[in-house]
Amino acid sequence: MQRISALGLDLGHRRIGVAGCDGTGLIATGLTTIRRTSFTKDMEILRQIVVDRQVKTLVVGLPYTMKGEVGTQAQKTQKLAKRIAKALDLPLDFIDERLTSHEAESMMREQRINPAEQKGMIDRKAAALILQRWLDQKPWLSST
């Protein structure tokens, strides 16, 4: 069986939620949240994660509008994601991230965690949801 190594990112203005998957590509898990400081420092952190996890693909959530259109925020996300993918020398795939942050907050409330006090956890969980959506769409997994 082919080993899957993808990194999911939830890109925000202040933070980047990061998620990884198990080698089978079945389960995505939140790894960390990077508090953005500068592009260079952010890339140092991401590069280390990529090396440690032997990442082969970058998956970024794209915030489409509720009508399914690429709006201003999605354009900004695409631009930053392409810059990150180039810096990390990784192929890039986008996935619809609509409502992932809301879904992450709901999950936290179910676990009796106050989302307002754990913004980094929201980003990390949203990144895991983004990566899980991508993994669930991959054809190599359904042929087992």
Curated annotation (Swiss-Prot):
**Gene Ontology CC annotations of this record:** cytosol
Q: Where in the cell is it found?
A: Cytoplasm
Q: Name one GO biological process term.
A: rRNA 5'-end processing
Which leading EC class covers this enzyme? hydrolase
The similarity annotation says: Belongs to the YqgF nuclease family.
The task this protein performs is described as:
Could be a nuclease involved in processing of the 5'-end of pre-16S rRNA.
Q: Which PANTHER family match?
A: POLYNUCLEOTIDYL TRANSFERASE, RIBONUCLEASE H-LIKE SUPERFAMILY PROTEIN
HAMAP family cross-referenced by the UniProt entry: Nuclease_YqgF (MF_00651)
Q: What is this protein called?
A: Putative pre-16S rRNA nuclease
Q: Which organism is it from?
A: Acaryochloris marina (strain MBIC 11017)
